[in-house]
Amino acid sequence: MTEHVAVDNLIIWEFDFAMTTFYEVDTDLINPLLPKQISPMEIVPGVSLLNITAFNFPEGGLGHLPNFQELIASIVVTPDLSRGVPKFAMFVFSLGSTCQEHLDHSADYYKLPSYKKLEYGKINRADNAIEFGDTDGSILTMNNCGTNIGDFLGHERYFQAFALQDGNLFIADLYL
């Protein structure tokens, strides 16, 4: 059964930096990672998308929380159109953050699975680069080598995040 997180009392996440990348992966490798109730969005037959996204949330960007960084690993999936048409829908299989309170909130409210608290999230705005690490060292370094970086601030976007918890599939409406 699919549980829906209520859309009343929506929380709007306000970020000031984001970077995302997509990797093409054979659907046969993706399917075992997904609950049977959802399916990956294929860009061509047999090819799905793995997504890595990093955010910087300034102090107050999510309620009373301090400035923190977030790192998400997800698979792009078919959306639930009965809830609206999102920019995209994702099945989140790992969430990392530099703020434990954010991880706790995300697990409780959105049912998102957390990796663990990250030791650091370094944002280099001048070079459009990020680096994240945990107690074992660096886990991700990413930079945008493009010269035309779009304006993502000041535009509210709707996303759907699917998560599996205790055998139940949850859908969270996210507004960024």
Task: Describe the function of each predicted region.
Residues 20-23, 75, 143-144:
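Short beta-strand element of the conserved SAM-dependent methyltransferase core
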Residues 1-59:
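Hydrophobic, proline/glycine-rich low-complexity stretches
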Residues 15-17, 22, 55-57, 68, ...:
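Phenylalanine-focused residue identity feature
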Residues 8-10, 62-63, 146-148, 162:
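Intrinsically disordered, low-complexity segments enriched in polar/charged residues with Gly/Pro
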Residues 57-139:
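Aromatic- and glycine-enriched beta-alpha-beta binding-site module
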Residues 1-2, 103-176:
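Interaction-surface and assembly-scaffold signal
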Residues 11-12, 30, 38, 43, ...:
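Weak global preference for isoleucine
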